[in-house]
Amino acid sequence: MSKSDQEHTTTEPTIVAEEELRIPELLPLLPIRDVVVYPFMIIPLFVGREMSIKAVDQALAGDRMIMLATQHDIGDEDPTPDKIYNVGTVAMIMRMLKLPDGRVKILVQGLVKARIAEFVEFKPFHTVRIERLVEPVAVDNLETEALMRTVREQLAKIAELGKQISPEVMVILENITDPGSMADLIASNLGLKLSEAQMLLEIEDPVRRLTKVNDLLAREHEMLSVQAQIQNAAREEMGKNQKEYYLREQMKAIQQELGDHDGKEELEELRKAIETARMPENVEKEALKQLGRLERMHGDSGEAGVIRTYLDWLIEIPWSKTTRDSLDIIRAKKILDEDHSYLDKVKERILEFLAVRKLNKQMKGPILCFVGPPGVGKTSLGKSIARALNRKFVRISLGGVRDEAEIRGHRRTYLGALPGRIIQGMKQAGTRNPVFMLDELDKLGYDYKGDPSAALLEVLDPQQNNAFSDHYVNLPYDLSNVLFVATANHSDPIPSALFDRMEVINIPGYTEEEKLEIAIRYLVPRQMKDNGLKAKHIVFEEEALKEIIAKYTREAGLRNLEREIGNVCRKVARKIAEGHKRQIRVTPAAVATFLGAAKFLRDDEMDKNEVGVVNGLAWTSVGGEVLHIEATTMAGKGGMALTGQLGDVMKESVQAALAYIRSHGSEFHINPDWFQENEIHVHVPAGAVPKDGPSAGCAMATALISVLTKVPVKKDVAMTGEISLRGKVLPIGGLKEKILAAVRAGMKMVIIPEQNRKDLEDIPKAMQKKVKIVPVKEIDEVLKLALEKFPIPAPKGKAKPATPKVVVRPSKEISA
């Protein structure tokens, strides 16, 4: 290490400019523990290690320059080179003071950054060869200026939040124009972690270093903001608690002076409420036991609040209060007819219940389940039943319920526990014999918390529900006098054990005539009232309502019909509000003006008799539909293609129909070798709509026989029925909806299975007069009615297979 020519006699040398500094290549190294020194930073250091003191002495004996580098571990007394950061700062020792305990205090000023290239000597102190780090000159542009201004603002904000920043530093920052110097000054005054401070020291680009400082300032600002919020909240809470404690103590003192014991009065009120609640003996015994526990507790304890809530529930649950049933059958029938047209099966069942109840007062309530499509009146029917019986009505929706505790409640050990939906509904009703509706029963779910449908088994079992146990109440409750009414759109999702406990009443969709009558009697008056209209403002023609039903709604229920009627009423209300004086008459021609273009067009009827095209009947979630089942043949190597998104059951129906045809090929004059040389393609239009079900078997067989024998099928004949390998026609479901679809499509004849003859009782006589319904037992009877010629004549020549007509069907899920 070179020595200065001039001997230093003062401890505070004159600092020269950075460009005038001559930094020696070899310098003594002073490892520092818990601080990072930046250029131009002035800081006092306490030196206690013998090796470090010798390094300071060596620097003072020369040009006072020393290399400062931070060691990784502050507790390491003798750090090896690999435990010292290789980037540090060359500093000038400005002052030195020897302390009585042998340590040395020095005041140093950082000069320039440098990197340790190698360790030259290790004894008696570390001597290192350094490489000076020259920073690139920052470009003076708007982005740099904006960054520096942002940093100043960030620093001012954290100073306002309580960060100790020297006022002198704030003044210096206002005059600094170099981003690197600004970054170093802030970093040295921010109190950063050792790793963060070292990381900033090692960044050579001044703009990038200042950007990192800005990020650290933003983090510090956010941390100080959160800290201030926590301190304010704690201060407020402490003040609030102290105030409450002071007021509570004052209140206790005042109550003692007045002889007022509010807690005892509350307990006495609870005791009286328990005695007047007419609880069963075992329930009253448990309530008094819990009241005794409450009396022995401090009023402010958490357990006391739990017991008090539990006692409130026991008092409010109706243990013995009932409403007196209205057993007037004539009155009940009148109420049911007022609220709902048709639905005769449901009304008949309720009147039967009233009749039996009149003869046997101890009869338990039935458990009914209404199954039908949306909008047919299942939920509103429950309200009518309650009104007819003079009972309270309570409804809970089970759609989306996935937790058993929703039905049975939570045990009282859980924080915020409450009874389940059943007990809550009974409390809401206020009597022990309400009409209790379990809506959307088929929408129940289940997960790892349990299966709520299993919890309903006890509720809906007349043999068990006289002692229903809720987890929260934990006492038997009698539900046997409750008239449970469940509703569902489909019966398939309901578990069989639960389904078996209920009396299922199917509510099919309405015919167009029924919808028309309901619209005239109920929907139009209700929508006129809801929209503030009177008879002098609007009148609906019957043909206009038919137009709305036929072309603007396609559903089994009435919701869309009421919605469209309401849409017309709103438009009329607007015209009246705008000053229209005359009565507005809604005619069929005016419907399109109010509602726009028709939403549903009739495309079910074919133009002529065609080969290989049959009118099948299907049931959908919105009622019945006519399906045009098409078949064609082509040259090939045998085989059959099925298209139209057919389900497995429908595909098997086609296979069964083809097997029957091949086994009876001679009757239809079909050469057995034909199936080896040709291919068959069966298609059901509306290919985007999934279709499944066995009831298209007859239609499939008829289409195949027609295309194989080239005998056309009558265009005005529709059919439904499953086919067996022996040619038997088997029964199907949804007959009313399917016949309604046939009538709507203009069919003149509907072929149904003989075993469905009993279901004709449910079909209105008016509908049966519009179409000829023919029950059949075998496929030969179907062919005789559906084909133009039967028996099949022998072919005279080879004919080209007929090209089926493609018909576009509405997009909805279809079950044949």
From Swiss-Prot:
One of its GO terms (biological process) is protein quality control for misfolded or incompletely synthesized proteins. The keyword Cytoplasm applies. The lineage of its organism: Bacteria, Pseudomonadati, Thermodesulfobacteriota, Desulfuromonadia, Geobacterales. The keyword Hydrolase applies. It comes from Trichlorobacter lovleyi (strain ATCC BAA-1151 / DSM 17278 / SZ). Residues 795-816 are annotated as: Disordered. GO terms for cellular component: cytoplasm. It catalyses: Hydrolysis of proteins in presence of ATP. This is Lon protease. It is an enzyme of class 3 (hydrolase). ATP-dependent serine protease that mediates the selective degradation of mutant and abnormal proteins as well as certain short-lived regulatory proteins. Required for cellular homeostasis and for survival from DNA damage and developmental changes induced by stress. Degrades polypeptides processively to yield small peptide fragments that are 5 to 10 amino acids long. Binds to DNA in a double-stranded, site-specific manner. One of its GO terms (molecular function) is sequence-specific DNA binding.
